[in-house]
UniProtKB/Swiss-Prot annotation:
Catalyzes the conversion of N-acetyl-diaminopimelate to diaminopimelate and acetate. This is N-acetyldiaminopimelate deacetylase. It catalyses: N-acetyl-(2S,6S)-2,6-diaminopimelate + H2O = (2S,6S)-2,6-diaminopimelate + acetate. Belongs to the peptidase M20A family. N-acetyldiaminopimelate deacetylase subfamily. The active site is at D69, E128 (proton acceptor). GO terms for molecular function: N-acetyldiaminopimelate deacetylase activity. GO terms for biological process: diaminopimelate biosynthetic process; lysine biosynthetic process via diaminopimelate. It is an enzyme of class 3 (hydrolase). It comes from Streptococcus sanguinis (strain SK36). It comes from the Bacteria.
Amino acid sequence: MLDYLNIRRDLHQIPEIGLEEYKTHAYLMQVIDGLTAGLDFVEIRTWRTGILVFIKGSSPDKTIGWRTDIDGLPIVEDTGLDFASTHEGRMHACGHDMHMTVALGLLEQAVSTQPTHNLLFLFQPAEENEAGGMLMYEDGAFGDWLPDEFYGLHVRPDLKVGDIATNRGTLFAGTCEVKLTFKGKGGHAAFPHEANDALVAASYFITQVQTIVSRNVDPIEGAVVTFGSLHAGTTNNVIAETAFLHGTIRTLTQEMNLLTQKRLREIAEGLAQSFGLELDLELKQGGYLPVENHPDLADELMDFFQKEEGVQLIDIEPAMTGEDFGYLLSKVKGVMFWLGVDSPYALHHPKMTPDEAALPFAIEKIGKFLDYKINER
């Protein structure tokens, strides 16, 4: 039997950012090879740093998929753990080390005997930065292994161990990264009439884009437009020639995301024209679509866990966090859910430390659900 704690702690020490998960890939392959050696009903494929493990059913009518992400974040860890990151400036601050450990535990259970239906395990790279699920899908990595149903989880620090939370609709927001540069003309602060101040235009832009949420978005639906970074100028008495802004759009429907992108572009172009500035605008959504659960499959999953002893099932509201599993769920029906890990620190925090008691709980309970799915008639 796998030692879940050691696996999680090993993985926690080697976080790597998207499409650079080389040590992680090697570690996972070593464990997977050990679990599947000599099994003629298991096949393995790789795609860059991603791994696909296909368990062929004895008389399959469908393929069930389980997806986990494997990348870390560019964060300096501050947990003080004995098994803290050994990679400088990298951390598993989003719990993907927990996700991988759960997936390996589920794989161990799944290969103990050949199931009736097919089961695919996807160890997906680059969730955080490059929408690895979309890259794999578009590159044909799944081939004829593409599931009929896809399932996955994400740890959640503000939920307790034993909590599983999901809903029958949108669970995560769709996100769009925004990069924007206004370019004017620099000059001496004493002679503003001889310059064209990009910083003034950027200031107007920051306030004007807030009207998208207040005046263009259905208040029942909601949206987020946040700019967390603004860089302009070099010193106090020089007018800024350029101003760079970096932000995000988050919405619960793709239609609203596209509307928000449209309005942001119109405001930026209008301000650039009115101030006589050049504009460089990049809107990058990629594969970060809203995570939309399939209502019938969500009903089935929620009913299953509602009846499972030791599980506290929560019908939860959507969150404005983003997840590239939304892209795969736009291609394959499925369900994502939260797994409680009871940490006082939020996801992406340098002190985020999940409760490892969630590992055996998740592997046992989710294992029962997958066993039901791959052996049902």
